[in-house]
């Protein structure tokens, strides 16, 4: 009986793909070796311990319908579009060895005519007249009896958009999280014009089979034809939830300040796991009472634009004479934290 398993996703949904990856990883026999090939539509994928408000331009992501997905491995933030080919290698211990999967990807690139090398922070690079350029980045996860190595190959990614979403607004964030290292990158199409996702997947698959000396039929999966994965519905619900993607952020502080015609405002937030644990308001407004009430009510509020806006607008009941000021304040807060 073969020890290999090959899965290929037809879905571009990052939450679906990451949920599939998580379920396979949890339920696979320790003797199995798995290759999972997939790709995501427009998504910023962040590491398990990263702060999305620190790493991402969340406002632009919302405007452009770009999703946020938190993965279960460590590492930095990356932008995925359909110009990225994603791979995941899984194996039980002691078979699991990330140098093996790195070798398989390098062999696949070599078979396509691209000479690449492993470098530094889990990257694969190619040499160009402008110096080394990154074509692949990876992250890893290990448990007691198994491990996985997943990463992306930059095929024909829109690199200008990558910069748009991974360069955050100059917010005054004093974060305890880590800001990712930005890397010089290149697309494989610069080296191999016309190369396709299917060709890259085929090359990785053949290198996988060649390394282990076995072949196996691919299992093609999508939301309409998922494999038998225990607890998939629960895993997908968690993967797609705000609580996981945003609420798992490290503790951080955020300062907002603005001057209105009726006075200047400073709001200070301390946020833990996506919830405001402390809020302070400072103002030279002639009537500071609404802001004082807002600071009190924001404690315990989810750090989401819609929730902050709801809390602010709820004050209209208690301060109807300050409707203009409160509506201006509400619109500003909602825009500032996106």
Swiss-Prot record:
<feature type="binding site">
    <location>
        <position position="134"/>
    </location>
    <ligand>
        <name>(R)-lipoate</name>
    </ligand>
</feature>
<dbReference type="Pfam" id="PF10437">
    <property type="entry name" value="Lip_prot_lig_C"/>
</dbReference>
<keyword id="KW-0547">Nucleotide-binding</keyword>
<dbReference type="GO" id="GO:0016979">
    <property type="term" value="F:lipoate-protein ligase activity"/>
</dbReference>
<keyword id="KW-0436">Ligase</keyword>
<comment type="function">
    <text>Catalyzes both the ATP-dependent activation of exogenously supplied lipoate to lipoyl-AMP and the transfer of the activated lipoyl onto the lipoyl domains of lipoate-dependent enzymes.</text>
</comment>
<dbReference type="Pfam" id="PF21948">
    <property type="entry name" value="LplA-B_cat"/>
</dbReference>
<dbReference type="GO" id="GO:0005829">
    <property type="term" value="C:cytosol"/>
</dbReference>
<dbReference type="InterPro" id="IPR045864">
    <property type="entry name" value="aa-tRNA-synth_II/BPL/LPL"/>
</dbReference>
<dbReference type="InterPro" id="IPR023741">
    <property type="entry name" value="Lipoate_ligase_A"/>
</dbReference>
<feature type="binding site">
    <location>
        <position position="134"/>
    </location>
    <ligand>
        <name>ATP</name>
    </ligand>
</feature>
<comment type="similarity">
    <text>Belongs to the LplA family.</text>
</comment>
<feature type="binding site">
    <location>
        <begin position="76"/>
        <end position="79"/>
    </location>
    <ligand>
        <name>ATP</name>
    </ligand>
</feature>
<dbReference type="InterPro" id="IPR019491">
    <property type="entry name" value="Lipoate_protein_ligase_C"/>
</dbReference>
<dbReference type="GO" id="GO:0017118">
    <property type="term" value="F:lipoyltransferase activity"/>
</dbReference>
<feature type="domain" description="BPL/LPL catalytic">
    <location>
        <begin position="29"/>
        <end position="216"/>
    </location>
</feature>
<dbReference type="GO" id="GO:0036211">
    <property type="term" value="P:protein modification process"/>
</dbReference>
<protein>
    <recommendedName>
        <fullName>Lipoate-protein ligase A</fullName>
        <ecNumber>6.3.1.20</ecNumber>
    </recommendedName>
</protein>
<keyword id="KW-0963">Cytoplasm</keyword>
<dbReference type="GO" id="GO:0005737">
    <property type="term" value="C:cytoplasm"/>
</dbReference>
<comment type="pathway">
    <text>Protein modification; protein lipoylation via exogenous pathway; protein N(6)-(lipoyl)lysine from lipoate: step 2/2.</text>
</comment>
<dbReference type="InterPro" id="IPR004562">
    <property type="entry name" value="LipoylTrfase_LipoateP_Ligase"/>
</dbReference>
<dbReference type="InterPro" id="IPR004143">
    <property type="entry name" value="BPL_LPL_catalytic"/>
</dbReference>
<dbReference type="GO" id="GO:0005524">
    <property type="term" value="F:ATP binding"/>
</dbReference>
<keyword id="KW-0067">ATP-binding</keyword>
<comment type="pathway">
    <text>Protein modification; protein lipoylation via exogenous pathway; protein N(6)-(lipoyl)lysine from lipoate: step 1/2.</text>
</comment>
<comment type="subunit">
    <text>Monomer.</text>
</comment>
<feature type="binding site">
    <location>
        <position position="71"/>
    </location>
    <ligand>
        <name>ATP</name>
    </ligand>
</feature>
């Amino acid at each position: 009986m073969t020890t290999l398993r090959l899965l290929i996703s037809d879905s571009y949904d990052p939450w679906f793909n990451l949920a599939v990856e998580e379920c396979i990883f949890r339920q696979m026999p320790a003797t199995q070796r798995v290759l999972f090939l997939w790709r995501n539509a427009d998504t910023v994928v962040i590491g398990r311990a990263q702060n999305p408000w620190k790493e991402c331009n969340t406002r632009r992501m919302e405007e452009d319908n770009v999703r946020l997905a938190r993965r279960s491995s460590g590492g930095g933030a990356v932008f995925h579009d359909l110009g990225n080919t994603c791979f995941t290698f899984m194996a039980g211990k002691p078979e699991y060895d990330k140098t093996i999967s790195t070798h398989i990807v390098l062999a696949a690139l070599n078979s396509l005519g691209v000479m690449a090398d492993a470098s530094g922070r889990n990257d694969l690079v190619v040499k160009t007249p402008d110096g080394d350029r990154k074509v692949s980045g990876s992250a890893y996860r290990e448990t007691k009896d198994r491990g996985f190595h997943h990463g992306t190959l930059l095929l024909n990614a829109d690199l200008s958009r990558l910069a748009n979403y991974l360069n955050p607004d100059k917010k005054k964030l004093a974060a305890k999280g880590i800001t990712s290292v930005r890397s010089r990158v290149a697309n494989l199409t610069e080296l191999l014009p016309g190369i396709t996702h299917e060709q890259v997947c085929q090359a990785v698959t053949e290198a996988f089979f060649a390394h282990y000396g076995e072949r196996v039929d691919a299992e093609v999966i999508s939301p309409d034809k998922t494999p038998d994965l225990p607890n998939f519905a629960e895993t997908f619900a968690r993967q797609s939830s705000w609580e996981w993607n945003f609420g798992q952020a490290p503790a951080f502080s955020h300062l907002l300040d603005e001057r209105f015609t009726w006075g200047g405002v400073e709001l200070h937030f301390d946020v833990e796991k996506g919830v405001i644990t402390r809020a302070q308001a400072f103002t030279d407004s002639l009537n500071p009472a609404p802001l004082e009430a807002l600071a009190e009510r924001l404690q315990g509020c989810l750090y989401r634009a819609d929730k902050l806006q709801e809390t602010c607008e709820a004050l209209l009941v208690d301060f109807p004479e300050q409707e203009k000021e409160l509506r201006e304040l509400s619109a500003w807060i909602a825009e500032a934290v996106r």
